[in-house]
């Protein structure tokens, strides 16, 4: 008996609820589905709105490779496993099997912006679909440059942009994906030049957030600031922080994202070991947000937090994963992380690999998606 063929609209409606990683496995099932997943921007937009998000932690190894991390917080014994590295071929190499050496990675909307040390280009990559876009920097390249990725979240059709900036310079440039062109943004209100910016930036709904410190102040009068770059208006702004961040003196402050709608900040008071984790309400257009305290801890003296430490929070379970610092005299070949809960219990887990983070591993979160990249006049490559 032959089953009746379902209407196209019904098939698309069903597929729009299937997680992105499962759709990848279905790509070879039907040529029509493959075209739908690869080229249909309308379906991509609907799928982004309806399908359940899959949050995948990633780390960078000492070999400049990205590796997914499986974290199990269920049961009485948490566990962590670093999976095999993800391949990103370097099309500019004479060796067809050569990998692109990644020293920094920035996630936005299912895309990874990857840079390589002392390399005058960067790549924007969708690991799920295999699509890459390589951007040459040419004469504008210098070793102090950093890059972030975003889009105008007020537009139905996302137009992606990358911003380049130098931590030691006030000049910034925007790269437009749709036109494959650069332009200087010198008419925006920027944070004061005396701000030190932490290198850990996070994207949320197309905009980028990171912490800064007023360099004119000295301990114990340091005060942190949460900075936002809006890719729609192309302006910087300041976002309110929870009460512990608004007082003088602190030992550490670290930023992270929770899901795809909230920010989290970890703050350790300077005078005590008390450490608090705060979470925002859902981030909207306004720079004023409300914060709620999720955890309050008193870590042991040998458990150190400092600026820029990577951490991931499970708000529902009230548990977070944070990277263990390496002491100056430690010579461990492999890195470790702590799993920390509201019972003030710190569980030490081994990474099993040596990561690129120097004194501490770097962990970020990636959300697989079908999102497509504007490719006007650019170099595009798809790896299946």
Curated annotation (Swiss-Prot):
InterPro entries: F-box-assoc_dom_typ1 (IPR006527), F-box-assoc_interact_dom (IPR017451), F-box-like_dom_sf (IPR036047), F-box_dom (IPR001810), Gal_Oxase/kelch_b-propeller (IPR011043), SCF_F-box_component (IPR050796). Residues 1-46 form the F-box domain. PANTHER family: BNACNNG10540D PROTEIN, F-BOX PROTEIN CPR30-LIKE. This is F-box protein At2g07140. It comes from Arabidopsis thaliana. The lineage of its organism: Eukaryota, Viridiplantae, Streptophyta, Embryophyta, Tracheophyta.
